[in-house]
Amino acid sequence: MNTTVTIVGAGLGGLTLARVLHIHGIPSEVYEAEASPTARLQGGMLDIHDYNGQLALEAAELMDEFRGIVLEGRQALRALDIDGTVLFERADDGTGGRPEAQRGDLRRMLLDSLPEGTVRWGHKVTGARTLDDGRHEVAFENGTTVVADLLVGADGAWSRIRPLLTGAVPEYSGTSIVETYLYDSDTRHADVAKTVGGGSMFGNGITPGLAINAHRETGDTLHAYVELKKPLDWFDAVDFTDAEVAKARVAAEFDGWAPELTALITESDIAPIHRPAYALPSGLRWERVPGVTLLGDAAHLALANGEGANLAMLDGAELGKALAASPGDVETALAEYELAMFVRCETPIEEDFLLESIFGDEVPQQLLNIFESQQRES
């Protein structure tokens, strides 16, 4: 296959695709809006699942490198009631199928595996159009354009490539996440650190739509995800530019919860960050459009739970393998890839039930059922 694959988006999915293509001798160019690899924080920890993310890393021939960035002990898990009572606890004995790593380390690992110059930084896409000859032109904010024989949109929730294939747009799910960080937690936030434990902590009560979850990340950092089912105008009324005001307003929704849980909000060392959760229509499909396809959130954005990144990596790996297997028939490769992706993303996964357990009507019992099922299977 002599065609250079044009990839928009240097996230985990787009970079996995570029890596698998590179292994098979297929050139690619990745265009990324960010100015550099260090332009912004790449998010927190990510558990790489043995049934999708790890399969992608195996296809990318990066499992050894991945093992080198795994955070030991972070598969430990506990579920707490609102009074701080531990309802379920599982230690990390090294046998779990979801090792944790920092998203930034994963991205750096993928970048280091590509030829120098593969990623073109500082290329924010403003639009894309189909040319008369069937190829696609991508326009960038810096005034330049590129014409692609084969274009892949790996550009996330608000993809500029998606309109070439479908008019679907993300809609607010009704749920938002408020992120907080507590640094040097063992020293400065000892009670909270003890409550969270060595890995992940899920705090849930009987009220649907409220949860305080946290992970222990590198450097004794606690990264909390406070989940609230509220309309967007509720969050619009919160002044997130004033850290103390925002912390107090969000914490007020958890009246009656144990102070060591609400401290994940009130003791945050940064201003809380509001992240509304958007999703594309469930079961989204489109008719084949020659020379272009999507992967990851650009194709099947769902509620943020870690599964999306794993699926994006698997999409990238599967697309790369499909193109390598049919170098003389790109359209057949794209059609087969899309069909498999559609089916894969329509299949209910454990994380779907996990979200329902957090925001459904029978919390925290549903959540405990999932954790206990996981423990039996392991």
Which residues fall in each region the model found?
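Conserved N-terminal helical subregion
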Residues: 2-5, 20-22, 47-186, 233-236, ...
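Conserved mid-domain beta->alpha element of the FAD-binding
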Residues: 7-27, 31-34, 152-153, 178, ...
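Short, solvent-exposed loop/turn segments at secondary-structure junctions
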Residues: 38-39, 128, 160, 302
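Conserved catalytic-core motifs of eukaryotic protein kinase domains, centered on the activation segment
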Residues: 41, 163-164, 305
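Short helix-loop capping/hinge motifs at secondary-structure junctions, enriched
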Residues: 64, 185-192, 260, 326
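FAD/FMN-dependent oxidoreductases across multiple families
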Residues: 196-198, 206-210, 216-222, 228-305
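Alpha-helical, largely C-terminal catalytic domains
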Residues: 335, 344-378
